């Protein structure tokens, strides 16, 4: 199956090259040889002739024509990162809620009940989760900080 696909592509390439190399008034189809190997060899010879006619372009010529500028897209980080307004509001509300809950004193009877224990566990879990999220975000920023340093313009 692959061999037939290669033969079909070779035939198509030979036909298109033959049409491109002829003047417009002579565009008519020629009979193709039935021997597949002869046709493939002929296609290779045509492509080699076409390559020898074209001027060679060295890698240095290509690089010298392009202007490559490498600059850092990183901006100096301030102590207080700028966050969208919605995130700031959300943080403020969360801190206010946590602050009000932490300032209320729990009586020993509250701590002995199931609700008091659940509340304390909830606060511990929330603090641990916030610390974990902060550390994870910090780690991800350190991983991807160098990805935006090189910019091609």
Swiss-Prot record:
GO cellular component: membrane
Tissue specificity note: Highly and specifically expressed in the lactating mammary gland.
Keyword Hydrolase carried by entry: no
Record: glycosylation sites: 34, 78, 95, 104
Pfam families: GLYCAM-1 (PF05242)
Top-level taxon of the source organism: Eukaryota
Parts of the chain that traverse the membrane: none
Leader peptide range in chain numbering: 1-18
Localization (cell): Membrane
Membrane topology: Peripheral membrane protein
SS bond list: none
Keyword annotations of the record: Glycoprotein, Membrane, Phosphoprotein, Signal
Region Disordered, annotated ranges: 95-115
Phosphoserine PTM sites in chain numbering: 47, 52, 56, 58, 64
Coiled coil location: none
GO molecular function term, any single one: identical protein binding
Family designation: Belongs to the PP3/GlyCAM-1 family.
Protein name: Glycosylation-dependent cell adhesion molecule 1
Species name: Bos taurus (Bovine)
């Amino acid at each position: 199956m692959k061999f037939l696909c290669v033969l079909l592509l070779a035939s198509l390439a030979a036909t298109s090259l033959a049409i491109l190399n002829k003047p417009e008034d002579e565009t008519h189809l020629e009979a193709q040889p039935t021997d597949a190997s002869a046709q493939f060899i002929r296609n290779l010879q045509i492509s080699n002739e076409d390559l020898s006619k074209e001027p060679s372009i060295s890698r240095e010529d290509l690089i010298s024509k392009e202007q490559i500028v490498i600059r850092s897209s990183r901006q100096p980080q301030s102590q207080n990162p700028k966050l969208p307004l919605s995130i700031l509001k959300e943080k403020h509300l969360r801190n206010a809620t946590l602050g009000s809950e932490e300032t209320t004193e729990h009586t020993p009877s509250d701590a002995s009940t199931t609700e008091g224990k659940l509340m304390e566990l909830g606060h511990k879990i929330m603090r641990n989760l916030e610390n974990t999220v902060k550390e994870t975000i910090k780690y991800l920023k350190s991983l991807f900080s160098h990805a935006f340093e090189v910019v091609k313009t």
